[in-house]
């Protein structure tokens, strides 16, 4: 009922309720529509977030279980690196004396450590080569009929330094003309305590004619960059190490006009070899691990400290025509 008295004397409670100050009263139907719209927006955001999280989980799972295939090679339009233009002077640091790594050879042979060389009687042919390159602690004593004796260069991994220097009569005195090229991460080669460089320098005091070089830190990065450029894979992210074979092949291409590789199998060898046939990984370790078991385990391992041997061989195959590389025993391109 309306108040018959003046407005100032009317009770406030007698006034009809109105909307709060500053707010506009909305019709009930509109409020319902807005509430429904807000719910739909929240649902859409939830669905999008759920989809993104699911995609991330699946991607992480696939990445963790990814097989290291050569399928993701460098882009076809990418111009390959010309290894012939790499600077020898900047890439290899003298450990003993102040010399520069001797280069060039017209014709080089790489003698692999493969047991495929056993029984080949290639020794005389290898001896006639202008320059002969061997790896790590692969001996010639007792195997010269198949692998020869001549050693112009020996490429040695940081993990094989002690195995080589413990047998100086085999690796230093037997072929005094040998030039040693040691490779390894700077943390291994030049760490403050127990530096491998110091170990090699002490050996040089005992054998003054020994000539040795280390792959420089800058060149080590180039080797990594080369692998990433050729395969599309980052070595560190794939939890692997480049093999001594990788370093040896690149060094041979740098130093030599033509390269003949003995004993290295093609990348598809293990998929075609009869399962019951066993071949030792090294010719000088007849009871050592099987060749294909070693290749396959290293290729697919995700636990680190492994080599991608098969992937590297595919890269070598792509280099064959580009750099004049020949493979034999077995023969392939």
From Swiss-Prot:
InterPro entries: Glyco_trans_29 (IPR001675), GT29-like_sf (IPR038578). Transfers the sialyl group (N-acetyl-alpha-neuraminyl or NeuAc) from CMP-NeuAc onto glycoproteins and glycolipids, forming an alpha-2,6-linkage. Produces branched type disialyl structures by transfer of a sialyl group onto the GalNAc or GlcNAc residue inside backbone core chains having a terminal sialic acid with an alpha-2,3-linkage on Gal. ST6GalNAcVI prefers glycolipids to glycoproteins, predominantly catalyzing the biosynthesis of ganglioside GD1alpha from GM1b. Residues 1-26 are annotated as: Disordered. Disulfide bonds join 108-256. The gene is ST6GALNAC6. The chain crosses the membrane at residues 44-64. GO terms for biological process: cell-cell recognition; ganglioside biosynthetic process; glycoprotein metabolic process; glycosphingolipid biosynthetic process; glycosphingolipid metabolic process; glycosylceramide metabolic process; oligosaccharide biosynthetic process; oligosaccharide metabolic process. It catalyses: a ganglioside GM1b (d18:1(4E)) + CMP-N-acetyl-beta-neuraminate = a ganglioside GD1alpha (d18:1(4E)) + CMP + H(+); N-acetyl-alpha-neuraminosyl-(2->3)-beta-D-galactosyl-(1->3)-N-acetyl-beta-D-glucosaminyl-(1->3)-beta-D-galactosyl-(1->4)-beta-D-glucosyl-(1<->1')-N-acyl-sphing-4-enine + CMP-N-acetyl-beta-neuraminate = N-acetyl-alpha-neuraminosyl-(2->3)-beta-D-galactosyl-(1->3)-[N-acetyl-alpha-neuraminosyl-(2->6)]-N-acetyl-beta-D-glucosaminyl-(1->3)-beta-D-galactosyl-(1->4)-beta-D-glucosyl-(1<->1')-N-acyl-sphing-4-enine + CMP + H(+); a globoside MSGG + CMP-N-acetyl-beta-neuraminate = a globoside DSGG + CMP + H(+); a ganglioside GD1a (d18:1(4E)) + CMP-N-acetyl-beta-neuraminate = a ganglioside GT1aalpha (d18:1(4E)) + CMP + H(+). It comes from Homo sapiens. Residues 1-43 are cytoplasmic. Its EC number is 2.4.99.-. The carbohydrate antigen disialyl Lewis a, which is at least partly synthesized by ST6GALNAC6, is a normal counterpart of sialyl Lewis a, better known as CA19-9, an antigen widely used as a serum marker for diagnosis of cancers in the digestive track. Disialyl Lewis a is predominantly expressed in non-malignant epithelial cells of the digestive organs, while sialyl Lewis a is preferentially expressed in cancers. This is Alpha-N-acetylgalactosaminide alpha-2,6-sialyltransferase 6.
């Amino acid at each position: 009922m309306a108040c018959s008295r003046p407005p100032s004397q009317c009770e406030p409670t007698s006034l009809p309720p109105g909307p709060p100050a500053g707010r506009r009263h909305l019709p009930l139907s509109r409020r319902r529509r807005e509430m429904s719209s807000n719910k739909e927006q929240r649902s859409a955001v939830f669905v999008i977030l759920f989809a993104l999280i699911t995609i991330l989980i699946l991607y992480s799972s696939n990445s963790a279980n990814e097989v290291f295939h050569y399928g993701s090679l460098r882009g076809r339009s990418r111009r390959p690196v010309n290894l012939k233009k790499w600077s020898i002077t900047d890439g290899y640091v003298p450990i003993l004396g102040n010399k520069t790594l001797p280069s060039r050879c017209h014709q080089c042979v790489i003698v692999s450590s493969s047991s495929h060389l056993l029984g080949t009687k290639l020794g005389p042919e290898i001896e006639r080569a202008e320059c002969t390159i061997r790896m790590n602690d692969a001996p010639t004593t007792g195997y010269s009929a198949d692998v020869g004796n001549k050693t112009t260069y020996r490429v040695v991994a940081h993990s094989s330094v002690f195995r080589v220097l413990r047998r100086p009569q085999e690796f230093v005195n037997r072929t005094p003309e040998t030039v040693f090229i040691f490779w390894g991460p700077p943390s291994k080669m030049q760490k403050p305590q127990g530096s491998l460089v110091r170990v090699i320098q002490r050996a040089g005091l005992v054998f003054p004619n020994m000539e040795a070089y280390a792959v420089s830190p800058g060149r080590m990065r180039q080797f990594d960059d080369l692998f990433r450029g050729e395969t599309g894979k980052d070595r560190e992210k794939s939890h692997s190490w480049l093999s001594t074979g990788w370093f040896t092949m690149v060094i041979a291409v740098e130093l030599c006009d033509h390269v003949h590789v003995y004993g290295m199998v093609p990348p598809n060898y293990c998929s075609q070899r009869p399962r019951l046939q066993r071949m030792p990984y090294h010719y000088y370790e007849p009871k050592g691990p099987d060749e294909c078991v070693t290749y396959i385990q290293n290729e697919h391992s995700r636990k680190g400290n492994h080599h991608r041997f098969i992937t590297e061989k595919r890269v070598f195959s792509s280099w064959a025509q580009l750099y004049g590389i020949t493979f034999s025993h077995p023969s392939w391109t």
